[in-house]
């Protein structure tokens, strides 16, 4: 019996309307829902994680010529990345910016840590050459309400906030 033809990861990424978990290891998860990339960071980003993010981003943007959006959930207490990783993240952001409608960071928690992380994220994107909309919020519901507007404006793909929230929560609930 012949094995079925191998599936193209890019085709899988393009066809998915349910939440697809693509990577889940070492405190870093990558998932997709429609043409939205969903990321969960529960530990400090490492060069290896950024390489995985870059690899995935390349395939995902190729699978979605209409454009994509990205939501990054950063768990309470996840350490700020060091300089090497900050530079790598900036490079990835710059490399894929022309394909991105919007980026939303959900920074869980409050206080000094959350303020420091928000400042880091603002600086990361402020210094990059970006044409996408950027939003930083403190909860998943706020992200699910904000993303559909800039996403539809750029990609012409309509997202239902309640469905988007469910997809984000699926990824977030992987760890607790």
Which residues fall in each region the model found?
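Amphipathic, Lys/Arg-enriched alpha-helical "gate/interface" segment within cytosolic domains
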Residues: 2-176
């Amino acid at each position: 019996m012949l094995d079925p033809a191998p599936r193209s990861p890019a085709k899988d990424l393009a066809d998915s309307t349910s939440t697809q978990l693509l990577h889940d290891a070492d405190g870093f998860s990558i998932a997709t829902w429609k043409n939205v990339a969903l990321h969960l960071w529960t530990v400090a980003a490492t060069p290896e994680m950024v390489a995985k993010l870059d690899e995935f981003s390349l395939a995902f943007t190729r699978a979605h010529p209409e454009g994509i959006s990205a939501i990054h959930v950063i768990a309470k207490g996840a350490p700020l990345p060091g300089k090497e990783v900050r530079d790598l993240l900036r490079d990835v952001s710059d490399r894929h910016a022309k394909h991105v409608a919007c980026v939303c960071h959900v920074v869980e928690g409050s206080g000094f840590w959350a303020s420091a992380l928000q400042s880091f994220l603002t600086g990361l994107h402020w210094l990059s050459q970006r044409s996408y909309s950027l939003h930083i919020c403190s909860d998943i519901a706020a992200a699910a309400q904000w993303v559909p507007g800039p996403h539809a404006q750029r990609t012409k793909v309509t997202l239902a906030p309640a469905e988007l929230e469910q997809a984000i929560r699926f990824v977030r609930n992987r760890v607790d």
